[in-house]
A protein has these predicted regions:
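Short glycine-rich, Thr/Ser-proximal phosphate-binding strand/loop in the N-terminal lobe
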Residues: 2-42
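Short glycine-aspartate micro-motif
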Residues: 3-7, 56-58, 143-147
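Short beta-strand scaffold segments in enzyme catalytic cores
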Residues: 13-17, 152-158
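A short, N-terminal amphipathic alpha-helix
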Residues: 41-50
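Short beta-strand-loop/turn "lid" adjacent to the catalytic site in phosphate-handling enzymes
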Residues: 50-95, 100-115, 145
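A gly/proline- and charged-residue-enriched helix-loop-helix capping module
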Residues: 109-141
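Small-residue (GG/TT-enriched) beta-loop-alpha framework at ligand/catalytic clefts
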Residues: 138-147, 158-159
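Single conserved hydrophobic/aromatic residue that forms the stacking wall/gate
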Residues: 157-160, 164-165
Length: 165
């Protein structure tokens, strides 16, 4: 696998690494975007500091990913998606909008929520979860991801049977 996962926002770049399929993420790092001239320098720093062999990347960005050019509203790291494969000599690369990434992550535990199972504490813990109103979850109810930021809110309606996770 040798996968770098990243969340690139306007202020911070968050990184983690997965050595093998189904292994835990490790080598967590939080870097200030303003400390680096570009995203390549930040990733190079992270990779060298942790002595990592990176073959694949999955990068969530606070920007649209529909075009080759990635442009941030409040971050000077503008770049082209196509340059990453060449620069880092990657096997696979995925860019996704950060809110879309959050929506897609819901599939990892949607079935557990709808069937009243306990959520894996590696995914979420008591600090991450806040009960707004107690009750019994409604099976197949829509889920919503919201948050601050300069982008638009994304929505996805996932059903447990629609995912293979």
């Amino acid at each position: 696998m040798k996968l770098l996962v990243a969340d690139i926002g306007g202020t911070n770049a968050r990184f983690a690494y997965q050595e093998k399929n189904n292994s835990d993420l490790n080598n967590f790092a939080y870097l200030k975007c303003s400390d680096y001239e570009n995203i390549y320098d930040a990733i190079d720093h992270y990779q060298q500091k942790n002595n990592l062999d990176i073959e694949n990347m999955s990068i969530a960005v606070a920007s649209t990913t529909k075009k080759n050019d990635i442009k941030f509203t409040n971050n000077h790291w503008n770049f082209k998606q196509s340059d990453f494969l060449k620069y880092f000599n990657l096997n696979k690369l995925i860019f996704v909008n950060d809110f879309v990434a959050q929506c897609l992550s819901l599939a990892s535990f949607y079935k557990d929520i709808s069937e009243n199972r306990t959520i894996n504490d590696k995914l979420l813990n008591d600090y991450d979860l806040k009960t707004i109103k107690s009750g019994t979850p409604i099976k197949n109810a829509p889920l919503l991801v919201t948050g601050p930021g300069t982008g638009s809110v994304s929505y996805t309606h996932l059903r447990a049977h629609e995912t293979n996770q």
